[in-house]
Amino acid sequence: MIVSAISPTRAKPIDPEYAALELTPENRFLAWANGRENVFLSGMAGTGKSFLLGLWMDSIQGVKPDVTAPTGVAALNGKGMTLHRWCGMGLGPKLFETDEADWRTCRTSEQVRQRVTACKTLVIDEISMLSGRHFDFLNFLLKRLRGNNKPFGGIQIVAIGDFLQLPPVRIDQSLAYDWVFKSKAWEEAEFQTTLLEKNHRQAGDADFIKALAGTRVGMLVGNAREILQARIRSNPPMNMPRLFTHNTMVDRWNTGMLAELSGDVKEFVGKPSGDAREVEAIGRSMLTPHGLPIAGKPTEPLRLKVGAMVMITVNNSETGTVNGQIGFVKSLPEYEDGPVIVDTREMGDVFVTPWRFTFRWRDKTAPKI
């Protein structure tokens, strides 16, 4: 059903420049993208979506497309920025609100207006994570900012992603997924769809590729289950990321790994400011009925050593770091409120300084932590 939902209603003819080429999915994508069609590029993991996008981007002369993604880490992987920041939609539209109402609360700076006005092509990576409501509002927003009633204000959209990998983000888990391909904006865009099918990441292992492809669509045939189970590691390397079901298990693991490192521990403690009663009330509100910290509460206290693996948990436009970015502590501050230097794969050394969180309690003056 998903395949039929995202297939184009009509395929545009290929530009004569590409007519003599072998009509591989890759060449179709290049032909449509260079012909300024709206294109949706999809395929299972390992089929080269990001590689093909990079190849196309490098071939463009003059103004390059603007690259975005729904999340900070995905945007960083594509050397771009979050879609929300790019278009100035802030936290995004409210689920049951109108576009006009959301527009009135949207704060688009002059920098955003200039960026949107100058844009010719917008790349949206990991499109499957974007909800239909957000995509519809993006369409509305670009039309309004550019004064152009064409789809997306006349900007070419190149969307990349796999709807069988990452679903759209849901604030309310009781609601069904708001798939972007069911939105009015998706229909209006008239995407030309390119599906990459050849797996390059596991090339040479045909049985494993078949097992992965079957898992992707929920169909394990033949000995696929045995092939996958044979890959289970009973003792994975210690530096591999781990997933746990409870925060207490996460804390226990992280504490144990920190103890394995040599050197001294440096402890960082938050400094609340504001009315004492407000600060106390906020502190209580961030605990569960059992007295445990709620999910999302800043780690208190934060204990670090040189060499510790850490994750950035906020987007910082000044440093370019994003929520979910991983690195290793390279050095600890020698003075109060000094920076922690973190070695990241994407950006090299970044300076992480104390971050201020603002909490509002009953609409009164917000204490700051």
Predicted regions and their residues:
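Conserved ATP-binding/catalytic motifs of P-loop helicase motor domains
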Residues: 1-369
